[in-house]
């Protein structure tokens, strides 16, 4: 289960730019969260309607909270023909799963439900290793049967795209805007974002990422600030989403290799890459993997990913790891 950290756009744009494009701002609700979009548009044309229509289409494909969606029907045991959006999300999820050795898995839904993370019904959770072992038999993308674009799930297998769907939504909105000739934009959905070109002042979009703590003064809220151009960014963290039962802290990130909530020293992971769907999924996978394994993966993907990690050492003190490419992007 991915949990985003709030992001803040530091550069406030003027109402118009030197090339007579006008700044348009769209916002709304989607997927249980909010979206905020800014873009430079000739004559100030707004694409709010098209954006909302696209988000509705995405919900109809991959939202587990819409009973009529493709993913919900699959989870109910129907054999159903998928659409382009579903296929895009699924194969991006599989790609990240393969690159991380299975630490990202879109079939973790039974585990998420067991641990009470869907409806925050954590008081009913009884930690039972035997029960978890049984559930684990229903986890794994290999338990999906594909024939052309028709899919059926093995008995008990359930899909959950929550850790990648918002990133995919960002990518699809970006595609929509570019098809309309918009080449300067900042798109944010639930904390995942993508930036292209410049803002109305002709400057690169500048982003602040919050410190992974609820006890930080607003003036000191940012862990780091970076310039973002023609890239996507996603941040995952567990400091806001967890519960304590019998003295044990259970974070909302599930480790699909063990069936248990991730137990490691990571506080937050920020990933920058070309596609927001991949940034979204990798950030979640790295939160499950822990620092050592994440650093090993990054070495193999250093031409694809930029990473900023906040973690604690054995004394509980905050430490950071920044990949070489990410260091060049940070401005504070």
Region annotations inferred by a language model:
Residues 4, 15-332:
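Mature catalytic core of soluble alpha/beta enzymes
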Residues 1-9:
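Sec-dependent signal peptide recognition
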């Amino acid at each position: 289960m991915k949990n985003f950290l709030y992001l803040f756009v530091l550069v406030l744009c003027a109402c118009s730019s030197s090339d007579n494009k006008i700044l348009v701002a769209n916002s709304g609700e989607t997927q249980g969260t909010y979206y905020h979009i800014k873009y430079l548009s000739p004559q100030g044309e707004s694409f709010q309607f098209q954006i909302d229509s696209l988000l509705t289409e995405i919900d109809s494909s991959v939202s587990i909270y819409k009973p009529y969606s493709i993913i919900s029907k699959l989870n109910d045991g129907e054999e159903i023909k998928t659409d382009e959006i579903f296929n895009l999300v699924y194969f991006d999820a599989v790609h990240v799963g393969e690159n991380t050795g299975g630490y990202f898995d879109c079939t973790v839904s039974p585990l998420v439900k067991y641990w009470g993370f869907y409806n925050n019904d954590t008081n009913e959770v009884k930690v039972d290793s035997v029960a978890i072992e049984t559930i684990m038999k229903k986890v794994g993308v290999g338990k999906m049967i594909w024939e052309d674009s028709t899919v059926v799930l093995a008995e008990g297998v359930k899909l959950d795209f929550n850790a990648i769907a918002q990133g995919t939504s960002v990518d699809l909105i970006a595609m929509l805007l570019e098809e309309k000739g918009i080449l300067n934009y900042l798109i944010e959905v639930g904390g995942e974002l993508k930036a292209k070109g410049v803002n109305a002042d002709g400057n690169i979009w500048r982003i602040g990422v919050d410190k992974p703590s609820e006890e930080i003064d607003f003036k000191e809220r940012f862990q780091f600030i970076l310039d973002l151009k023609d890239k996507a960014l996603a941040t995952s963290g567990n400091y806001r989403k967890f519960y304590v039962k019998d003295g044990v802290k259970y974070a909302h990130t599930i480790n699909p290799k063990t069936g248990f909530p991730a137990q490691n020293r990571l506080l937050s992971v920020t990933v920058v890459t070309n596609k927001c769907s991949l940034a979204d999924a990798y950030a979640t996978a790295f939160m499950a993997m822990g620092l050592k394994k994440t650093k090993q993966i990054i070495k193999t993907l250093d031409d694809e990913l930029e990473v900023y990690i906040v973690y604690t050492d054995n004394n509980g003190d905050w430490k950071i790891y920044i990949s070489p490419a990410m260091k060049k992007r940070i401005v504070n």
